[in-house]
């Protein structure tokens, strides 16, 4: 007998109480359709040529199962595949065959409500297959209970789960409910777990009507059989099929088919205190089937917190199957308040936990992958320690009070002078041995629950000063999310080292064939820095004068900013010409290849192995030749040398700001949306640059400027964190603007934000564009 685990909850789904509540809404739960007889009748329906949905999906799976398997399965992680509502599994077998052919070990679970029919389907599948790589099991239960115990079916913490939701069953939900249904699964899945889902589009009304009201009246038998299921739940014949007739209605404008049972005459139903009296022609809704255009499908997917990977179309009818993946939580494009909300914190923390719990492991967290930097284990401790130190200024944390020794080891990292490493700002002492990752994860959890969650929930009670501390901690976490990631990619050392935990490989970016186009910018006056006027306090601000009196810097009347962003200044920028896009990998490679082999020094984002060049990405080492159209990322010194070879230079901070203002059509507003660009974890790799005339910014890398970080007029060190900028007024750090694909939107979208790195630093995700006078 095939293994089946019963996860329960059927007694709730099929209870007299749930049916009574449904009848009060003039409907019956559609799950009642699928008793043993109902499943057999539905099987007959799928064999009808009129029921185009089945044939359309079969058409897709026959043609594309191999491609779908490649996208769903991880080649290097354990794979779990769960089908939601498996039915007879004839179509599913096409996918299982493709999984077997791929040669990856897969544990497949078929989920269904009816244990007897599930057992029968699994036995038939086992009798017709002899899989070596695919293990087949069953789960008897409902979707809600599966969500509660989903991790039980994940073979290892890092294993990939792919869900199958076929048959256009998502159409049982209206569009808002469909997105909510997807979100319920997204909330339980890991980043880059997958879902294969089918949608029936808006086919012609005649085709739809025939599919749900066939001339053989099998659909009618199927729908009316729900009354037998109701009677079985109540244990007596409360409903007589002969009192009802099937009514099929398709609303073409709304795009929904509704199946009703209509009372032929007056019907009375009595069971104890339950009493219903249905008048002639009264309608009871049995099920809905919503039809969605491709655009509507994409909206449902996006609102469901998934990202579209690929789409497969049927040639039989307007019907598609989509591979979608759990994406990073969407970050707010335009902050509504100075201090990040709990929802913003939660989105950022999910990224951090993905890094510390999924990407970092015993093989990569103890090695210092970047010279003159700590190993990743330091950052696992640094983030919660920094939060603990600063948030304790607001409220003591009893949960972490006995771990003050962590403060000595993790308060501040190292950033020594590249040219003379003996010169370094003050930093925490390095322990003889680092605490275990589990100890640090528990510490982070305590800091999260007892500090961040409590403070965010009490936001209205916090003073402006206290909100500022909470904001500072949020942006500090965001910065170290990016730092830890660019250190992580340096751990890839072998040519065959690719990982699928971050999803499918990015599409190749072809080498550009044209020089960049030049954008002529006339003499312009710009405002730099955080606005100091009250013109922005209308954006939901409720700050009172009493709040401001407690504020460390009263120039910040709404949004917070770091010390090097303040005060706001006016600058006159002379006319200049700037490239419409950053320098590409291909252009920089051509520049390097003009040198002798002994003089060639490649960017640290590249790796030369056995004479072949690779690029370090979130997906491992990929052939550089496939991504020559991405922006090159290396040090200021490297890119400044390239600019000189082209008879150009790199832009000043004011010039680059002026160009960004022009492209984003911004003036002095604090935040501008970067939706659709390569920042804020909207994707995990740079954008492919283009030869066209578009002005390309936020392409996945920060951008260097020739402006050296210096103490500007009226600069005042950050009172909470005075060493943030002033430790780096050494003439060796250059200002960096924009953001990478891994930069939180509170930072990348803030016009005044200024990053800075040593000009010789090669490891950060920073590119550049050319300028000429």
Curated annotation (Swiss-Prot):
Localization per Swiss-Prot or TrEMBL: Cytoplasm; Nucleus
Assigned keywords, A-Z: Cytoplasm, Iron, Meiosis, Metal-binding, Methyltransferase, Monooxygenase, Nucleus, Oxidoreductase, S-adenosyl-L-methionine, Transferase
A GO MF label: calcium ion binding
Leader peptide range in chain numbering: none
Start and end residues of each stretch annotated as L-histidine N(alpha)-methyltransferase: 16-322
Binding site for S-adenosyl-L-methionine: 85, 91, 112, 142-143
Region (Hercynylcysteine S-oxide synthase) location: 347-772
Residues involved in L-histidine binding: 51, 172, 212, 287-289
Reaction catalyzed: L-histidine + 3 S-adenosyl-L-methionine = hercynine + 3 S-adenosyl-L-homocysteine + 3 H(+); hercynine + L-cysteine + O2 = S-(hercyn-2-yl)-L-cysteine S-oxide + H2O
Cofactor requirements of the protein: Fe(2+)
Record InterPro entries: CTDL_fold, EgtD_Methyltrsf_superfamily, MeTrfase_dom, SAM-dependent_MTases_sf, SAM_MeTrfase_EasF-type_put, SUMF_dom, SUMF_sf
Main location class: cytoplasm
Sites where the protein binds Fe cation: 382, 476, 480
Cytoplasm among keywords: yes
Cofactor note: Binds 1 Fe(2+) ion per monomer.
Pfam families found in the cross-reference section: FGE-sulfatase, Methyltransf_33
Disruption phenotype: Completely lacks ergothioneine and its precursors (trimethyl histidine/hercynine and hercynylcysteine sulfoxide).
Function: Catalyzes the SAM-dependent triple methylation of the alpha-amino group of histidine to form hercynine and subsequent conjugation with cysteine and oxygen to form hercynylcysteine sulfoxide, the first two steps in the biosynthesis pathway of ergothioneine. May play a role in meiosis.
Family the entry assigns: In the N-terminal section; belongs to the methyltransferase superfamily. EgtD family.
Record protein name field: Ergothioneine biosynthesis protein 1
Species this protein is from: Schizosaccharomyces pombe (strain 972 / ATCC 24843)
């Amino acid at each position: 007998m095939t293994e089946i685990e019963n996860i329960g909850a059927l007694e709730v789904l099929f209870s007299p109480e749930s049916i009574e509540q449904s009848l009060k809404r003039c409907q019956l739960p559609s799950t009642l359709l699928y008793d043993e007889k109902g499943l057999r009748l539905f099987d007959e329906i799928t064999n009808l040529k009129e029921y185009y949905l089945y044939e359309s999906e079969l058409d897709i799976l026959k043609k594309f199962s191999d491609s779908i398997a490649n996208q769903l399965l991880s080649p290097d992680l354990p794979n779990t595949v769960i089908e939601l509502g498996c039915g007879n599994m004839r179509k599913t077998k096409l996918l299982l065959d493709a999984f077997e052919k791929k040669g990856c070990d897969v544990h497949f679970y078929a989920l269904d409500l009816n244990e007897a029919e599930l057992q029968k389907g699994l036995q038939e599948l086992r009798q017709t297959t002899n899989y070596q790589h695919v293990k087949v099991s069953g789960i008897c239960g409902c979707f809600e209970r599966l969500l509660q115990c989903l991790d039980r079916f994940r073979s290892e913490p890092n294993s990939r789960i792919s869900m199958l939701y076929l048959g256009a069953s998502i159409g049982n939900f209206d569009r808002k409910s469909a997105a909510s249904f997807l979100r319920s699964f997204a909330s339980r899945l890991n980043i880059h777990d997958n879902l294969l889902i089918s949608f029936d589009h808006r086919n012609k009304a005649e085709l739809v009507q025939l599919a749900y009201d066939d001339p053989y009246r099998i659909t009618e038998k199927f729908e009316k059989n729900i009354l037998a299921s109701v009677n079985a739940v109540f244990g007596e014949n409360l409903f007589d099929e002969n009192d009802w007739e099937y009514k099929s209605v398709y609303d073409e404008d709304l795009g929904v088919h509704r199946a009703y049972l209509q009372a032929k005459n007056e019907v009375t139903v009595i069971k104890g205190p339950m009493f219903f009296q249905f008048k002639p022609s009264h309608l009871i809704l049995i099920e809905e089937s919503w039809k969605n255009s491709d655009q509507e499908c994409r909206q449902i997917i996006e609102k469901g917190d998934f990202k579209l990977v690929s789409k497969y179309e049927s040639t039989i009818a307007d019907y598609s199957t989509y591979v979608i993946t759990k994406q990073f939580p969407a970050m707010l494009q335009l902050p509504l308040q100075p201090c990040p909300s709990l929802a913003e914190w939660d989105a950022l923390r999910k990224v951090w936990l993905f890094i510390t719990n999924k990407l970092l492991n015993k093989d990569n967290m103890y090695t210092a992958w970047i010279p003159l930097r700590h190993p990743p284990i330091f950052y696992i401790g640094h983030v919660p320690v920094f939060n603990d130190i600063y948030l304790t200024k607001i409220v003591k944390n009893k949960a972490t009070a006995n771990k003050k020794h962590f403060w000595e080891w993790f308060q501040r990292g190292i950033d020594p002078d590249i040219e003379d490493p003996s010169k370094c700002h003050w930093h925490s002492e390095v322990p003889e041995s680092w605490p275990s990752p589990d100890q640090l994860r528990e510490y982070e959890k305590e800091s999260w629950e007892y500090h961040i969650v409590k403070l965010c929930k009490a936001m209205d009670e916090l003073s402006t000063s206290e909100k500022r501390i909470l904001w500072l901690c949020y942006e500090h976490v965001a910065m170290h999310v990016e730092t830890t990631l660019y250190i992580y990619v340096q751990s890839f050392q072998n040519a065959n080292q690719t990982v699928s935990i971050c999803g499918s490989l990015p599409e190749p970016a072809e080498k550009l064939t044209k020089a960049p186009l030049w954008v002529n910018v006339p003499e312009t006056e710009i405002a730099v820095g955080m606005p100091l006027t009250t013109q922005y306090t209308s954006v939901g601000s409720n700050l009172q004068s009493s709040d401001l009196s407690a504020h460390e810097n009263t120039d910040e009347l709404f949004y917070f900013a770091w010390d090097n962003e303040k005060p706001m200044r006016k600058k006159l920028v002379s006319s200049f010409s700037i490239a419409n896009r950053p320098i590409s990998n291909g252009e920089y490679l051509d520049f390097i290849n003009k040198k002798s082999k002994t003089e060639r020094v490649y960017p640290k984002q590249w790796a030369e192995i056995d004479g072949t060049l690779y690029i370090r990405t979130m997906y491992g080492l990929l052939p550089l030749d496939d991504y020559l159209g991405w922006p090159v990322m290396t040090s200021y010194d490297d890119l400044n040398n390239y600019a000189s070879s082209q008879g150009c230079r790199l832009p000043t901070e004011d010039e680059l700001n002026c160009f960004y203002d022009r492209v984003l059509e911004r003036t002095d507003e604090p935040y501008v949306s970067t939706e659709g660009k390569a920042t804020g974890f909207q994707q995990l790799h740079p954008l492919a640059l283009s030869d066209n005339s578009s002005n390309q910014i936020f392409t996945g890398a920060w951008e260097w400027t020739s402006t050296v970080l210096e103490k500007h007029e009226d600069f005042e060190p950050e009172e909470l964190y005075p060493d943030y900028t002033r430790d780096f007024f050494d003439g060796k750090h250059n200002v960096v603007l924009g953001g990478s694909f891994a930069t939180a939107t509170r930072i990348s979208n803030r016009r005044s934000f200024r990053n800075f790195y040593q000009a010789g630093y090669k490891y950060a995700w920073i590119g550049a564009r050319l300028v000429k006078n």
